[in-house]
Amino acid sequence: MRLRKIWLLCNLVCIIPGAFAQQFIHPGVLHSEKSLERIKRLVDQKAQPAYGSYEILAKLPEARADYQMKGPFEIISRDGKYGYTKGPSERDFNSAYYNALLWKITGKKAHADKSMEIIRAYARTVRQIPPTNDAPLCAGLQGFILVNAAEIMRYTYMETHYPNGWSEQDTECVEAMFRKVFKPVLSKLFQTAPYTNGNWGIAVAKAQLSFGVFLNDRKLYDDAIDFFYHGKDNGSLPNYIAESGQSQEAGRDQQHVMLGVSCFADMAEVAWTQGDDLYGALDNRIMKGYEYIAKSNLGYDVPFVKWKDITGKYSHLSTFGKEGMGRFRSVFEIAYNHYVLRKGLEMPYTKIVLGLVRPEGPGFTCDNTGLGSLLYYLGDDLNTGKDRGRIEEDLTQLKAWNFSTASYRAVNGVMSLVSSGVKLQKRVQYDSSAYPNIVVKAPGIPASANKKWLTLSYSISAAPESWEFDSDKAMKVGEDIYVFKITDVRSKNGYSFSKALTNATMTLDFGDTCGEPVVI
């Protein structure tokens, strides 16, 4: 009898190939049900930096439930005759994704319906990505954003629960779009002799991996992972990031470097959601790529070797590329939260970068999702342990500041703000009645700096008001701590600062420091 059972089991496996193959997790491209619940919980708790990233998302035009779709287009392209569709279709795909996220965060059906409207419109309409030069980037980058939106809606807004929800017809139509319009473009790049910089192959691979999940197509998924490890292309991991962390494109502008390495992180996060660890590949090679980017773009010296790329076309890049240096994209949270908060490793230079860019805003066009402080943050609320409404800023920590007019980099081995006009801003909550003293620790302000470098501002009756503080009148504690009293100043129109807990903008404007760095 026992032998008969074994014989029957063997025959069952033969009759149903893949019957015991690992099933895909849904929703499960970038976001599992568990991760979507975590995102909502962080927003409900107003936990920072996630809530700050959410506030940025909620204000984006593409995130509105009444967003006016620019398409759909029968043909989408990044260049050539139909290149005019690039911007509009990118905004539409981002809108589908943002509204899908906001549906899960807020529970508002208007966001779900907007996402469904865009997904359905393109699934019914788009029929081609023409074979122009940039076709792989169009299918890879834009396809990745759209499939993430579709995955969320397919498994969280079904017609069995909502009148306008996802139906079997939607499944057929959307799957057909991805298979017939997007997938052939991806496949063509894999089948063609290598001819591009590495970010192309990585963008294509992350989209194919994601389509594999959405389409429940194990071969698509496995082929993408095989390319990740073994692809004879600049876009495979060993061919793109060296053991030192230097990338194949490190001699180009730094935005392409950030695109390439962050696409690996996107790909690794999709695989992680499915139970596969690409993050750990080649001794955490993606982490090393991030640390190299962070360290070099902060102004530290890094090793650089002339790269012999797979195509032979780009081996002339003999020095580190300084174009775009220090302009950090919103791509750092995803890797930091995995390696540091999931795995307990250290990323000291990426940590510094996050001090500059948190909360992360949206991605650049469809290159990445951005918003990582909302989507991937796994740490404690940064407000925990702080007295609500108190302003005590330590510039040596440099958390959550936004500065478009200052570059943060190492000067003679010391981290400094350098620019012809150093200006930083951040959003704060201030309770002037409970905490009349505003404390700022600023270790190295040049003598040539603007004396009235601290300002608080908010609107009264829709009119902007600002309170300006003179550092010469501040109480000094030691050489680097300034204590300003809110009761000593009035706004330019004579108002006292509100005694209620107030959302305000805090600005540090050091002005033209004659080339001297603001050492922090």
Spans of model-derived segments:
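Noncatalytic modules at the cell exterior or secretory-pathway interfaces
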Residues: 494-508
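Long, repeat-rich segments with strong aromatic
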Residues: 213-304
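Extracellular carbohydrate-recognition regions
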Residues: 386-407
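Extracellular ligand-binding interfaces
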Residues: 410, 415-493, 509-518
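Extended amphipathic alpha-helical interaction segments
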Residues: 175-204, 208-218, 227-236
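Extracellular glycan-targeting catalytic surfaces
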Residues: 21-194, 248, 273, 278-391
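An alpha-helical repeat/solenoid feature that recognizes helix-turn-helix modules
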Residues: 139-142, 201, 257
